[in-house]
Regions:
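N-terminal strand-loop-strand
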Residues: 1-12
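Unchanged
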Residues: 16-105
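Polytopic alpha-helical membrane proteins, predominantly small-molecule transporters/carriers
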Residues: 110-114
Length: 114
């Protein structure tokens, strides 16, 4: 999917949620941002840092934990539908498409998990 601001290809991300474990918050963000539902791993498969531009023009560094989600289906409608482009890629295509080098490596290793 693309970011709303820059239109670059990203994975669903969000802020920590009160009373939600990190993996549950990640599953919620995936639903809200890309409309996908499935089984999510409870442990992160990797992490990376990126700069986020806030509404007031301020930039902050965010540490992102990445959780694998085995998608079972995509809903016909979801909260942010129409605000982003959503597209399915092969693992190799996805790795080439994202900008963050660490995220590229995480995506490439997805098929090698046990």
């Amino acid at each position: 999917m693309t970011s709303r601001g820059t239109g670059r290809w990203i994975i669903p991300k969000g802020w920590p949620m009160k009373r939600k474990a990190p993996h549950a918050a990640a599953a919620r963000e995936a639903l809200e941002e890309a409309g996908v539902v499935g089984q999510i791993d409870k442990q992160p498969i990797g992490s990376f840092s990126h700069e986020k531009l806030l509404k007031k023009g301020e930039t902050i560094v965010c540490d992102v934990q990445v959780f694998a989600l085995e998608v079972t289906h995509q809903r016909k409608t979801w909260r942010e539908k129409g605000k982003r482009s959503v597209q399915w890629f092969s693992r190799a295509e996805a790795a080439r498409t994202v900008r963050e080098p660490v995220l590229r490596d995480i995506i490439r290793k997805l098929g090698k998990r046990s």
